[in-house]
Amino acid sequence: MLKPPIGILGGTFDPIHIGHLRPAIEARDALGLAEVRLLPNHIPPHRASPFCSSEQRLAMVALAAAENPGFVVDERELKRDTPSWTIDTLIELRHELPDTPLCFLMGMDSLLGLPSWHRWQELLDYAHLVVSTRPGWQPDYPAEVAELLARHQSQQVADLHRLRHGRIWLADNLPVELSATRLRALLATGADPRYLLPPSVAQYIRQQGLYRPA
């Protein structure tokens, strides 16, 4: 008998904002996830180094998790001195949680770029992929991704509960068009970030003087 599935959401979280949290909340509720683990990256392999320190980003993620029932912080990637490869994290989690389906949460942009990920063909050997989509948007899938969807896409939530891994679920989320880059630019102007990130995170950013021009 398998345990209820859990969600895995990795990211730089520089800072964490509603573009990260809202799809994760919807996945938690729609898919019946027992918890959502937030994993801040230490060395993100696909983007520039973070603006804030690991300690500051971890503090913001912890504040965001405290405001959302079922959300917890997983620090394992911050403790590594190597790039934060998703496959390494999923392998570790699978060993720790052999009877728990793992649902790796990602955006559509990440799915479209999946063939550039380290050992991407192995991800479904350890987890399901839960992909946030935009209502009415028909993406132009690369051939490798289209083939992956043809073999692994599921139409039944129950599949994510009865199988440990191997399915892809396209989640029809409310659109949230916000990136950390745009948010940092807004914060640099001193504008009010209300409703764009959790109140406790906004307060922390103000107290620490983060994202202000040098």
Swiss-Prot record:
Pathway: Cofactor biosynthesis; NAD(+) biosynthesis; deamido-NAD(+) from nicotinate D-ribonucleotide: step 1/1
Keywords, ordered alphabetically: ATP-binding, NAD, Nucleotide-binding, Nucleotidyltransferase, Pyridine nucleotide biosynthesis, Transferase
Superkingdom in the source lineage: Bacteria
This enzyme's EC code(s): 2.7.7.18
GO biological process terms, semicolon-separated: NAD biosynthetic process
Catalytic activity line of the entry: nicotinate beta-D-ribonucleotide + ATP + H(+) = deamido-NAD(+) + diphosphate
A molecular-function term among this protein's GO annotations: nicotinate-nucleotide adenylyltransferase activity
Signal peptide extent: none
Keyword GTP-binding: no
Family that this chain belongs to: Belongs to the NadD family.
Function, as annotated: Catalyzes the reversible adenylation of nicotinate mononucleotide (NaMN) to nicotinic acid adenine dinucleotide (NaAD).
Full protein name: Probable nicotinate-nucleotide adenylyltransferase
The organism of origin for this protein: Aeromonas hydrophila subsp. hydrophila (strain ATCC 7966 / DSM 30187 / BCRC 13018 / CCUG 14551 / JCM 1027 / KCTC 2358 / NCIMB 9240 / NCTC 8049)
Lineage: Bacteria, Pseudomonadati, Pseudomonadota, Gammaproteobacteria, Aeromonadales
